[in-house]
Amino acid sequence: MLTHGVFKQWRRRVSAAFHALYRKLLPIHWWLVDRFSKQVAPPGLALPPARLRFQVTQSTNAWLFFRFGRRTAQDIQIVLAESGYSLGNFQNVLDFGCGCGRTLLWLQSGFPKVNWSGTDVHPEMIEWCRANIPSARFTINAALPPLEYPDSGFDLVYAVSVFTHLNEEYQRAWIPELRRVLKPGGLLLLTFHGEHVWNVGDDASEVERQGIVFRTSTKLRGIMPHWYQTTFQTPSHLRGSLSAHFTVIRHSSKAFGDQDAILARRD
């Protein structure tokens, strides 16, 4: 009979082997979806290739891609409205970690008078955005600062499902950089994995003790870089990271599905 320790070791090996095979088969799956799927974009929007959709949502399903993007665009407006702000009143807005435009596709369509910008670490995604979202400006950023923007250029920066993946070193590097590109009084909207996510698993006591825990995802290993995996943190820990650079206005639990949101102001 297998002991508990031996069983856990065997299970890890089987899981690692399965995910290694899974990653090898992914390019074939992406090609088949692009070649034979009849998935289409909503009117007026463009459909990114399956490979890019998967890197953003871990799914090639076009309906889910657009559904999540529309829901995120709505959630941004709700969080802002709860603190008395209207998205249409902002002049220059940056999508930090825009990917292949899952959210920006909807926002630029709904708010054409806003000057939209997007930046991401993936050149292929930015290339696609430049070709398919001509109303916005796009840049490629490195894994660490700086961004290719002047000081005080934006009155709103949002980063949805970015700090859910960055390790603490990278988070602490990016927070002052996001402050730099914001105007005085500008807003930063971040999402993160809140207590309702990490409090149900083995990570709960460690997150409570340390404030933040970074986990390498078996599914994302080899697909995403080592510093961009899965991060759990307490609201107080993120508030502490922001406090030297921003005034936190609001913490909204489960504002973006399974992610919490923090809205902060550059003073």
Region locations from a protein language model:
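A short acidic, Gly/Pro-enriched loop at the edge of an enzyme's catalytic core
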Residues: 147-157
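A short glycine-rich, Lys/Arg-flanked "PGG" loop and its adjoining helix->strand segment in the class I
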Residues: 172-184
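Class I (Rossmann-like) S-adenosyl-L-methionine-dependent methyltransferase catalytic domain
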Residues: 8-92, 99-146, 168, 173, ...
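Short, intrinsically disordered terminal tails adjacent to the first/last structured region
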Residues: 1-2
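A short SAM/SAH-binding and catalytic strip from SAM-dependent methyltransferases
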Residues: 156-169
